[in-house]
Amino acid sequence: MEMEASYNWFLVGLSFLISVFGSFTGLQITNGMKSSPQGVSLLWVFAAALSLGGGAIWTMHFIGMLAYQVPMDVGYSPGLTFLSLLIAIVAVGIGIYIAVSGRLSIVRLLGAGLFTGLAVASMHYIGMAAMVMPGVMVYDNTLVGVSIVIAVVAATVALWLAVNLKGNLLMLGSAVVMAIAVCGMHYTGMAAMGMEHDHSAHYVAIENSMSPMTMGLFIFCASMLLLVICLIMSLHQLNSRMDEELGEPDHI
């Protein structure tokens, strides 16, 4: 029999906030790379991938998982959890590199969006498979398909915005839209999942030393700190470049 599940709405709110800030930071970094006379830097590609893939997508996903409450003990496989994080960062990094390393044609955009979106969807379902509990997951294939479509569309739009946006206000608005899309994909994927008790299965508990609320707050704060560092570094680079450009006439 399928179990009733509920959500901790405070953690749901945190998952949305981190997705907005991660999206904004990633857009800032990518926009700075696109306008840089030095061209694409792999270090900044990594920083953007860390912000978007690690912050806006994976951290949102994991806090959203912690917000999901079922009447049984739930642990997380460290190996699969780390794999899902790695997939998110690497896939988004590849997508960003494709987007900023040359003229973003329709073919390049759609190809990068498809690859990144499918990888993000894979990250989500691998992350869900990392849940360790005395139960089995059952899926609604229609909702799974919808979540994958949302992931591909969201990734494609995100890559286009990352390359074409100018101005902090537009970036903030776009970051909110991106966060809505990322959360939409995640919670559609969660809605596709049902949970049933499996009394016959061999279950090895993975103890969590922290409650879901404590763990969610810890991950939120750690991710925010990392994103703030990335954003400050990006803004510092942008200000230094502007100072250099303003100083150029003095040398003519």
Regions found by a protein language model. Give the residues of each.
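Peripheral, non-catalytic segments of secretory and membrane proteins
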Residues: M1-I252
